[in-house]
A protein has these predicted regions:
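Conserved SAM-binding loop of SAM-dependent methyltransferases across substrates and taxa
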Residues: 28-40
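Conserved SAM-binding strand-loop segment of SAM-dependent methyltransferases
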Residues: 66-78
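Conserved SAM-binding loop
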Residues: 57-58
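A short SAM/SAH-binding and catalytic strip from SAM-dependent methyltransferases
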Residues: 90-106
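A short acidic, Gly/Pro-enriched loop at the edge of an enzyme's catalytic core
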Residues: 82-92
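Conserved beta-strand signature within the Rossmann-like core of class I S-adenosyl-L-methionine
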Residues: 122-129
Length: 166
């Protein structure tokens, strides 16, 4: 069961049934399972740095995992590599992830640089902190990431390694 806060986050996501979704900082997997229920023709990959969180997520997700609709992995976003057949992702979301909410700016730069490679060209990134979410724009151009004024942006002058889904 989702908390009211996580339910509001999931409800705010612009989800389509065929999306590939990445959740960063999935904790025990409640939001990942809720999103997986809404993407019956897609996939949710949920990651967390905590082994305990991933163990809890896996324990509560047997049916969705068996159906190939959700996968959990213990890894930091900076080190995450999609498995064959996964990605690029249409949507990425994160709730209370220090690398993306401004608490850890150096890790944030690494995380957003990694997300440039993981998202489709039209992929969207949402983090908590809005009402209930805010979208983080990944701009093309010189790489930048500014936590000081509450605005977030990152970009690349060239995009490499993107492949289109067929």
């Amino acid at each position: 069961m989702l908390s009211a806060r996580l339910a509001a986050v999931v409800d705010a996501l612009p989800i389509r049934p065929d999306m590939q979704v990445l959740e960063i900082g999935c904790g025990p997997g409640a939001a990942a399972r809720a999103v997986a229920e809404r993407v019956p023709d897609g996939l949710v990959v949920a990651i967390d740095r905590s082994g305990k969180a991933i163990d809890q997520a896996v324990a509560g997700s047997g049916g969705l995992m068996a159906a190939g609709r959700v996968r959990f992995e213990r890894v930091a976003i900076e080190d995450f590599v999609a498995e064959p057949g996964e990605g690029p992702f249409d949507l990425v979301f994160a709730v209370r992830v220090g690398a993306l909410d401004g608490r850890h700016p150096s890790a944030g730069e690494q995380a957003l640089a990694r997300l440039c490679d993981l998202l489709t060209p039209t992929g969207r990134l949402f983090i908590d902190g809005g009402d209930p979410l805010r979208e983080v724009r990944l701009d093309r151009g010189p790489r930048r990431f500014d936590f000081t004024d509450g605005r977030y942006a990152v970009g690349r002058s060239a995009v490499h390694g993107r492949r289109s889904r067929t």
